[in-house]
Regions:
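Bacterial N-terminal signal peptides that target proteins for export
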Residues: 1-12
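Intrinsically disordered, low-complexity polar regions and short flexible loop motifs
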Residues: 23-437
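C-terminal motif of bacterial Sec signal peptides marking the signal peptidase cleavage site
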Residues: 18-22
C-alpha cells in the first residue's frame, strides 16, 4: 500500500532545524493509525519524505514535495516502526543515513527535515503535550544542534534587554536535549539564546514571538553554516510552523601588520578591535549584522575601508596584513561545525599572516600533512588529524627567509576545531594556536 500526500501550505521562513519526539515502537497494526506531517526547515530545497514500514516493506508512504519553509497536511499511516528518508527534488542535498521512527496508534507527529552543511536529515516530534490552563501557552525547547554546544534560553519582555546577572528561563540544553514544558501567559515575548552560563555569548535573538491562549509550542534550535550561531523553528502542536533565521554573523579581526602598530577595526556598528590594540593581535568573535557591511580600519590613525559580505549564521576571520602604510584586507569563512562525536579526529588549519614572505607555508602535525601552499593573506582548508596530548608541529616554507618552525607541546582534543595563526615576519614569526570550538 502506498499513500502520497501533497503540500497544502507554506509557512513563514527564517530558520532551520529540528525538534524531538517520542518514538513509539512495535510492529505495524492496520487497525491503529497515526497522523504524520512533514515540515521542511531547509534554506531553499524542496523535500519529500519517504517512509517504509519496518513490519511490511511493501507498505510505504510519501509526504511532499514540500518547499522550503512549507509543510504537508497531516495524513494517516499505520502505527508501528518506519524507516524514514528525506530527499531533495534536485539532489542538492545528500540524505543522512535512514532514520527509524515510531508512530503510536492515535498519535500525532511532525517529521521535521533540516539541513546541515550539504546534507539533509529529519527528526520525529510527538505532538502530544498536555493543554495549558486558560490564558496560558506551553513552551518547550529542543536543542538539535550538535555544533552550538550547551545553550541557555531566556524569555523576556519584548522591550527588555538581557542583563549579565539574569537567570535563564530554560537552561543547560545540550545537543539532543528537550527542556521541560514551561507555561507562559499568552502574549508576545523576546527570546534570546546564549551559550550556557554566558549571557554575553548570544547565539540567536528572536525580537518578538507570539504565543496565543492554549498554544502548545515546541521551539527547535538548529545549526547554521558557521556552527556557533543557531536558527529556530517554532512548531505549534497540530498547527502552524514558523522559521526564525539568524540575522547575524560572527566576525573576528586579526592584525598582522608591522610590529607595534596601533590598530582599530569595526564592521557595521560592531567593534572588532578596540582602541589601542597593538599588532600582531588576534581578536575574538563579535556579532555583526549579516549582508553587506562596511569594514573600517585605522592603522596609527590612518583610515582604510572595505566591505564585507556576510552570510547569516556564518563565522568569519578578517585578516589585516602587510605593511602598515598599505595594509591589505582579506576575509575568510570559518567552519566551526562539530565533527562526529565518535572517533578521535579534529580539524586543523593554518592562516598565513607573515609580512614579506615570498613563498607559501606548509604544515605537518605528527608527520601528517595538514596544509600546503598557504599563501600570505590566506587560510588553508581544514585538515583532519588525530587528537594528541603533545603533538609535533612542523611548519616550513618555500621561502628560504623562513627557516622553519618545529615545536612539541599543548593538547589537541578530539572533535575540536583549531587555527594556527602565523604572524610577524619570516625572520621572527609569531605563532599562535587558537581553539575555535
Amino acid at each position: 500500500m502506498k499513500a502520497i500526500f501533497r503540500l497544502v501550505s507554506v509557512f513563514a521562513v527564517s530558520a532551520l532545524l529540528a525538534l524531538v519526539a517520542g518514538c513509539g515502537g512495535g510492529s505495524s497494526n492496520s487497525s491503529a493509525r497515526a497522523n504524520v506531517r512533514l515540515v521542511n526547515a531547509t534554506t531553499g530545497a524542496t523535500l519529500t519524505l519517504n517512509l517504509v514500514s519496518s513490519a511490511n516493506s511493501g507498505s510505504t508512504a510519501t509526504f511532499g514535495p514540500a518547499a522550503a519553509g512549507g509543510a504537508t497536511e497531516y495524513n494517516g499511516v499505520d502505527a508501528g516502526a518506519w524507516s524514514a528518508t528525506v530527499v531533495t527534488s534536485d539532489n542538492s542535498l545528500t540524505p543522512f543515513t535512514t532514520a527509524s521512527f515510531g508512530f503510536a496508534g492515535d498519535g500525532t507527529y511532525t517529521v521535521l527535515a533540516y539541513q546541515r552543511s550539504g546534507s539533509v536529515g529529519a527528526v520525529n516530534i510527538a505532538d502530544s503535550t498536555a493543554a495549558p490552563d486558560t490564558g496560558y501557552a506551553n513552551l518547550r525547547v529542543f536543542n538539535t544542534s550538535i555544533d552550538a554546544g550547551v545553550l541557555d534560553v531566556y524569555v523576556l519582555a519584548t522591550t527588555a534587554t538581557l542583563g549579565s546577572g539574569a537567570a535563564p528561563t530554560l537552561g543547560a540544553l545540550g545537543a539532543g536535549i528537550v527542556s521541560a514544558t514551561t507555561p507562559l501567559p499568552a502574549g508576545s515575548y523576546k527570546l534570546v539564546v546564549t551559550a550556557a552560563g554566558n549571557p554575553s555569548q548570544v547565539r540567536l535573538t528572536i525580537p518578538s514571538i507570539t504565543v496565543a491562549d492554549q498554544d502548545q509550542m515546541t521551539l527547535a534550535l538548529v545549526s547554521t553554516s558557521g556552527g556557533a550561531l543557531v536558527d529556530a523553528v517554532s512548531i505549534k502542536q497540530s498547527g502552524s510552523v514558523t522559521t526564525y533565521r539568524n540575522s547575524q554573523a560572527r566576525v573576528r579581526a586579526v592584525a598582522a601588520l608591522d610590529s607595534k602598530q596601533l590598530v582599530t577595526a569595526s564592521a557595521g556598528t560592531s567593534v572588532l578591535l578596540g582602541t589601542g590594540v597593538v599588532s600582531p593581535s588576534i581578536g575574538t568573535y563579535t556579532l555583526v549584522d549579516s549582508g553587506s557591511q562596511p569594514l573600517n580600519v585605522t592603522v596609527n590613525g590612518v583610515a582604510k575601508s572595505s566591505t564585507l559580505s556576510l552570510a547569516a549564521g556564518g563565522d568569519y576571520t578578517v585578516l589585516l596584513y602587510g605593511a602598515s602604510a598599505s595594509p591589505a584586507i582579506t576575509a575568510v569563512a570559518d567552519n566551526n561545525q562539530a565533527l562526529p562525536s565518535t572517533g578521535s579526529l579534529l580539524n586543523f588549519r593554518v592562516v598565513n599572516g607573515l609580512i614579506g614572505l615570498n613563498g607559501t607555508l606548509a604544515l605537518t602535525l605528527n608527520y601528517t600533512q595538514v596544509a600546503t601552499s598557504v599563501a600570505a593573506g590566506s587560510a588553508s582548508g581544514y585538515g583532519q588529524v588525530t587528537s594528541a596530548a603533545a603533538p609535533l608541529f612542523q611548519l616550513t616554507s618555500s621561502d628560504a627567509a623562513f627557516t622553519g618552525y618545529s615545536a612539541t607541546g599543548g593538547s589537541l582534543v578530539s572533535q575540536g576545531v583549531y587555527t594556527m595563526f602565523v604572524l610577524g615576519t619570516p625572520a621572527a614569526p609569531v605563532i599562535t594556536i587558537v581553539k575555535d570550538r
